[in-house]
UniProtKB/Swiss-Prot annotation:
Residues 324-334, 379-388, 418-437 have a biased composition (Basic and acidic residues). Gene3D superfamilies: Transcription factor, T-box. It comes from Homo sapiens (Human). This is T-box transcription factor TBX3. Keywords: Developmental protein, Disease variant, DNA-binding, Nucleus, Phosphoprotein, Repressor, Transcription, Transcription regulation.
Amino acid sequence: MSLSMRDPVIPGTSMAYHPFLPHRAPDFAMSAVLGHQPPFFPALTLPPNGAAALSLPGALAKPIMDQLVGAAETGIPFSSLGPQAHLRPLKTMEPEEEVEDDPKVHLEAKELWDQFHKRGTEMVITKSGRRMFPPFKVRCSGLDKKAKYILLMDIIAADDCRYKFHNSRWMVAGKADPEMPKRMYIHPDSPATGEQWMSKVVTFHKLKLTNNISDKHGFTLAFPSDHATWQGNYSFGTQTILNSMHKYQPRFHIVRANDILKLPYSTFRTYLFPETEFIAVTAYQNDKITQLKIDNNPFAKGFRDTGNGRREKRKQLTLQSMRVFDERHKKENGTSDESSSEQAAFNCFAQASSPAASTVGTSNLKDLCPSEGESDAEAESKEEHGPEACDAAKISTTTSEEPCRDKGSPAVKAHLFAAERPRDSGRLDKASPDSRHSPATISSSTRGLGAEERRSPVREGTAPAKVEEARALPGKEAFAPLTVQTDAAAAHLAQGPLPGLGFAPGLAGQQFFNGHPLFLHPSQFAMGGAFSSMAAAGMGPLLATVSGASTGVSGLDSTAMASAAAAQGLSGASAATLPFHLQQHVLASQGLAMSPFGSLFPYPYTYMAAAAAASSAAASSSVHRHPFLNLNTMRPRLRYSPYSIPVPVPDGSSLLTTALPSMAAAAGPLDGKVAALAASPASVAVDSGSELNSRSSTLSSSSMSLSPKLCAEKEAATSELQSIQRLVSGLEAKPDRSRSASP
């Protein structure tokens, strides 16, 4: 059959674009779909149903395939049938066979539903959506094995009443609230063949109940007004919107269709189960329903008292890991009390799941062991990032390149004295000067010491007893003193607990320096002898801990430390073993301040320069010549203040900068220190709201000499340039000059 190049135009084909609704055929006619072109499907393909009809004159009720075949036989071109005729006949367009089916639906877990129904089933609704329990599960039978079905469910209001739970029963409380938007849940496996549906239990466990009206999940379909089941617009999604304190009835539907978009024009078979009726609540009202949920729902662990939730399981795993770590370290390091006491405290900060709870107690380890008050997300994140959380919570820090987890050599063990300072003797304002703290033992670049010499003297016998004391007395707030370790060899770390830097009970688990910023670059610590005065006061290890580098202040040699200490009139050993308040004096005499609050430099260098200039006259006074004979005389001059009060500065804020050339000229071998001080004008803010009961980090010039009034007059009399020069030359001053400067 040959077709002409130009197809003739048949009058009446334009009628195909006008809406025309014929009488409904027994199966279903799709002419309305082709004529209306609904908004949800602007380019609807020809339907697979064989009952679809085009709006050609005289062929309104003919199936589309019959029209195409008849047109080919009569010689009518395909283009004359309208634009839809150009569409290729797909397999889904073929008419389905007429199948007789009789679906039957059986509710799963009917006995459990009956138990809930007798007591009045309650379902919790939340903003984010809550799944149903018992879940809605059915088993289907009687379906055609080859035909495709769509299975879905919706929840409708059982009545027009609002309820309240009163006197252990539900009673009507008024008229129902306005109905929520209609929402249906289509099973995610739809469409599927009848054989697939009948081979398994159909569960709607992913359906969620919510009271969030603004929920936008899903899509919307428009149902015709003459639909047997639904009319109007319905949205399809995973969440159904309900009103609290209203009674609802779930419904189950079976639709024989192979496309979800055909739902508005398909026949629904609806099934109701009265035992699935429930009342939507925001919190369980009936205790019997709550108990039923606990007894039957394996996920209802928020109400349990037996401790089967995730938090309880984490605690059990933590206790189990404690025993495993104890046994492992006993095998590696022997069964002696000494090795076990060393390992117990190291494991406390080695891993988040280590014997932290059994060693120190949960009162001081809230950052390491998840408590009941924590949320699951926080506890899980701490478990997932165990090493990072461990390192951030460490109070004992090192500058070694070697990992802190190396458990092989006992010399690399960082010991935490958890209960070294009980509360009765831990107050700084009540203890005597000689019994307040043991001298701080700080070792810097001590390569010649052996493992036994580097061990702290307090470690041998007191740690187990103190740990037991802290465990037996949970009311006591144990302090966690700072342990500063440095060594340039990065192989064996010296041990030096610094009790004067102990944190308060609330800060026991926090990081070194308590989060205060320190605007010092590690490159400023890389110059040898730059901070020799700090090393003289025992500050070399502290700066090395701040820099975090293995080549920083730990590179300070012994000669620089010894020479600076000799200039102060102290030996190298006494400079490192001074009590903490005397170390503050030595630091302040060099223009530096060491704050017990956790910050190193709590005010700018200009303030420190002024303080050092004022105290340079007393740098070699009798206080420094006899450091241990004047303890009682010096103690009343120490100021107790929770705030950092800056030392008064003479006029001219650029005091250090203007005098820099003269300082560089007169510095000589000390120009490295001057340049380092001038090049890094750091200003660190101290937490003024801190409740630490310790002395202020600011030491005025009057606390450096025996006569504060004379020193104040001396400071006012001297000029700024002379003060700076005296700072530089004070270390090399002769004894007779220092005697004339002191009263």
